[in-house]
Structure formats: structure tokens, C-alpha cells
């Protein structure tokens, strides 16, 4: 796998280096015990950890945000990750204090430490940064940069955000995409740029504004053949197309979108009016009538009951589209699947995606969590760890973390000499302020290895 314009682990030899490894392992937590309810994101970073295990690995991560009930220490994450990989991980209950810096400096090759929740620091979460450059001059970055050689990131789920530990190391040291980040970028780029055809996108969920922006971006790329709208997004598209979905369902969409309603409506209207041949809409639905699932055709609308699922006839029409597709992108549930009586539509689409021979890309969030909970991750081509970041990527929105990786590639790739060395201005605290060269830090030449070499 190769990601254009980004340094990856295939380009580097990190043996003996101190590696800052930024991850997004933000996980659901049981309120009373503080135990992790899902370790999927921890498991997702294991391939990168295996690749850099001969380094001195310093893990950086966040859990939730200040003021939330699940804003906790990273201790439980550290303990669970240690169990998963079967190796000792030292937890440091701090981020960049003198104690934390001293512990990092004492590390030996093969050691792994896990720093505490980076969002405990105001400059990580309490400040709005207008550019990646502003994050580079923060205290957390300058202090950690003095004791580190390379920055590796698997924090794709936060790639649409900007903060010191996500985007601040660009010009301090080489910034490299980990295995997870590389796979996310590569798979989602394929969904946008050059997917196998025919290409079917199934877009649902309650975040209608995100889904219709993704749809419009896919259409603008000219690579998608059919877009099937399901879930609340499907309800919005039915409304836009002239079906009266009932005041209760209209109000739910208006309220959930709030200030974004008009923009989402306008985008949905453009899609419907300009590309009707590309749109697949439900032909029947299921509503909740006093706790009972009731099937309805569109001719029976309007309804004052909440629409919680697509109908069986809709699924019958969707199945051959999935079967005949060469690529399927699915983001967002088709139903209120947390209620057993209304899980049917979402589960059926999942079954279609696991049974097809097509390339299947699951777009993160609730859809990805469902794939994990049902143990079928190995039956889809790519199950994204992102939620908002996946939608931002597919919508064509700015991705500060990926921009940082690209900038670092330009900053350091161009300094690699024919001898396989990289000129590197980053200095450790105890070193003299001279331009420094790290032999073979950044190049594994084609057809050969890039030696583990000296440190300077």
C-alpha cells in the first residue's frame, strides 16, 4: 500500500528512535467502573505498534473532552492495550511535565509508555487554532519535540481536527502515517478517486447534512453510479421529492439539524433535481405505532408515527444493486437499529455487504460499530475507524492532520540525499545547536532496506 504525498512506515527505519505515537482510542466507558466497553480502536493500532516495537514508543491520546462524564485518565486504556499486545506498558500520569520528560529520556529500545489524557491541557483542547502553524509553537509540542525523533499518527478518527498533538509536530520532526492511517487514507481515497465500477453508495443515519454533502461530493467526482438514501437521510430525500412524511418526522429532521437544516435541504434538493437518475429512494417504510412495527407504502403517507426503518420491498430492490456492484460504500444505519423491532433494515444491508464479492467500504460511526459488534470486520474490505472524520474526508472538507502529514513530507523528503540521509534541524535538549544529520532515518531504498544506522 502506498499513499501519495505522505511518509509511511515503509519509508523509514525507526529502530532505536524515540517515536511519538499519536492515536485516537476514544472509547465508550462504563460510568460506574470506568471500564472500557469497546476496545476496537485499541486493537486497530496494534499493527503499527508491531511495526515500531524496536523503537522507544511514547503513546499520546485523548479520551472524551473536559466536562463530559467519560473524560478520564488514559490508565485503563494503557492497561487494556498491554493485555491486547501481551507486553508491558508504563503509564505516566502526566503529559509533558518535567517528570514525564525525564521518564521519556530514560526509555530503552523496546519500551512503551502511555502518557495521560492530552486534553487535560488547555492548549490541547481549550484554544481554537486557525492554522496548523499556530499549534507548532505550543508548550506541549516544544517540550515533547526535544525528547523525540519521529512522530507517527494513527489518529484518523481525529484527522478532521486541529490541535497541538495532532498537527503541531510538522516542522519539528518527520511526521509519518501509521498502518491504520495509511489504510484509512488509501481506502477512502479510492472511494473518491478511482473506485471499481459500478459503484454504489448507501448513505443513511441521522446526520442528514453530512450524508447529503458526501453524496454531492461523490457526484461531483463523477465516479459514483447509484446513491441509495436510507435512514433519516432517506426520509429527508423522500420529503424533498414531494412525499409528505408527516409533521412529526419533518419536525425531527428540522430539530436534529437545527441551524444546518436549510443548507441540508438545499443540497438534497439539488441532488434530487439535477441527478434523479442516480438516486435510489425507499418505496416502503416501517413506523412505530405504540411499540409495534407497522409496514407502510409511500402511497399511505403521511404518517404521524415515527419512521424507524425502510420496508421489506425497498430491501428487495436494494439487494441486486449491492450484488451487481463492484464497489459499495455504506455509511449510516437504515433504521433505529437499537430497537430490536427496527433493526431489520440495517442488519439486512450489513448482510448484503458481507455476502457480496464487491469491494466494501464501511464509513465509520454507528455503521462501523455494528460491524465490530457482530464480528464481521473480516468480511468487509475496509471498516473505517472514523466517524466525523470519515464524513469530512468523503465530503471533501479540509483534513488538518492529513495536511500536516503532507507538509512534513515536503519538509523532510526533499532533504534526503542519495546516501539515504536526512538533514534534520530538530535537536535534543543536551545537543549543540548545529545542523544535524540522522543517517538512514528516513529512507528505505527501492529494492533494498534502509539500515538501522547511527543516531548522530
Could you tell me what each predicted segment is?
Residues 310, 425-426, 440:
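Intrinsically disordered, low-complexity regions enriched in small/polar residues
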Residues 425-434, 449-456:
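Conserved small/polar residues in nucleotide/adenosyl-binding loops
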Residues 1-421:
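Active-site loop-to-helix "anion-binding N-cap" substructures in soluble metabolic enzymes
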